[in-house]
Amino acid sequence: YVMISLLMCGAVAGLMCISLASPLAKKMIGMSVASATAAVSTLALFNVLGRISAGLISDKIGRINTLALACLLSIVGLYFMYISGEGDVRTFYIGISIIGICFGSFMGVFPGFTADQFGAKNNSVNFGIMFSGFAIAGYVGPTIMTNTLKATGSYKGAFLIGIAFSIAGLLLTFAYRSVNKKVNTILAAQK
């Protein structure tokens, strides 16, 4: 459950922005349709970069450390989105790029993380179960955005909620370490 919750928390920020990147660019920053389309492409590009680079990073510093770093950077990216406003293209692009990298990091690392935890034998089934966290985030992220816009007339408050999810994800990386340490201690004692 910790891993499913971690994936959900880690994916919320990306799914908040991916689903509404063009409307965010137009409404918050005042971008034209063409410029908003470029913002969507930028998010997609950084998503791909996150998938590739996070895999390389996780091989060096470990999967859970990489996911913790992605949660931490998501907080930064969401903060940049929160402070961006009309005409503030640079801050918006910094935020959307960081969020893209972090979202890609979760998508790139989680299959290997699942295999490391449960073994390769049933990885397709196990990752399918883990992916339920992504499905939940796919509902929660966009819902936060649309409900915040309806309630306040702005997307800004949604980024604060996204930050709370990223903080929860960061805390879950510590919970995972604690649970995993206890499980490994029990398994070692049984040998």
Language-model segments: residues:
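Extracytoplasmic gate region of multi-pass secondary transporters
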Residues: 1-54, 141, 145
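Juxtamembrane helix-start elements in MFS-like secondary transporters
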Residues: 31-40, 88, 92, 123, ...
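Helix-to-loop junctions at the C-terminal end of transmembrane segments
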Residues: 51-62, 149-150
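Cytoplasmic membrane-interface "Motif A"-like loop-to-helix N-cap segments
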Residues: 60-71
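C-terminal ends and interior cores of transmembrane alpha-helices
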Residues: 73-86
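Intracellular juxtamembrane helix-capping segments at the cytosolic ends
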Residues: 105-118
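A late C-terminal transmembrane helix in Major Facilitator Superfamily
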Residues: 117-154
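Multi-pass alpha-helical transporter architecture, strongest
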Residues: 163-191
